Amino acid sequence: MQVILLEKVVNLGNLGEVVKVKDGYARNFLIPQRKARRATAAAVAEFEVKRAELEKIAAEKLAASQAQGEKLTGQTVQITQKSGVDGRLFGSVTNSDIAEALTKQGFAVEKAQVRLPTGPLKVAGDHVVAVALHTDVVVDVTITVIGDHA
């Protein structure tokens, strides 16, 4: 199925590009999330009319994400978790725990934006975690997991 992208989609294309994707990907993800529309002649003409408005919205989102990224760069977040004497945690620190801690510090971050490539943090200490604020803005944040030997 051919679709027109209404915003930048990672590993697919940029705003306004007409790309060919599998039917299920378009029907179940891109179209319901309003990231794309079917590429009919009428839809292409309608998109060209709205292109400037959509590009302006995309630029505003990028600028807001970059501003938040500058504030977030170099931040350190401390999370306390119960642990054993060897530093291994009882349980783990997940992306939702990190997002919650960042929100308490005044940064609007959702758990889906926190990237933990090796999975949840299971050891006390300092960990560098990526936070994807936008498809083009990824910031590294230091998470200090403090083991509570209670």
UniProtKB/Swiss-Prot annotation:
One GO process term, biological-process aspect: translation
InterPro entries: Ribosomal_bL9, Ribosomal_bL9/RNase_H1_N, Ribosomal_bL9_bac/chp, Ribosomal_bL9_C, Ribosomal_bL9_C_sf, Ribosomal_bL9_N, Ribosomal_bL9_N_sf
Source taxon at top rank: Bacteria
Leader sequence segment: none
Any GO molecular function: structural constituent of ribosome
Keywords assigned by UniProt, alphabetized: Ribonucleoprotein, Ribosomal protein, RNA-binding, rRNA-binding
GO cellular component terms, A-Z: ribonucleoprotein complex; ribosome
Metal-binding in keyword set: no
Keyword Cytoplasm applies: no
Classification via Pfam families: Ribosomal_L9_C, Ribosomal_L9_N
Record-stated family: Belongs to the bacterial ribosomal protein bL9 family.
Its job: Binds to the 23S rRNA.
The name this protein goes by in its record: Large ribosomal subunit protein bL9
Lineage of producing organism: Bacteria, Pseudomonadati, Pseudomonadota, Betaproteobacteria, Burkholderiales
Gene that encodes it: rplI
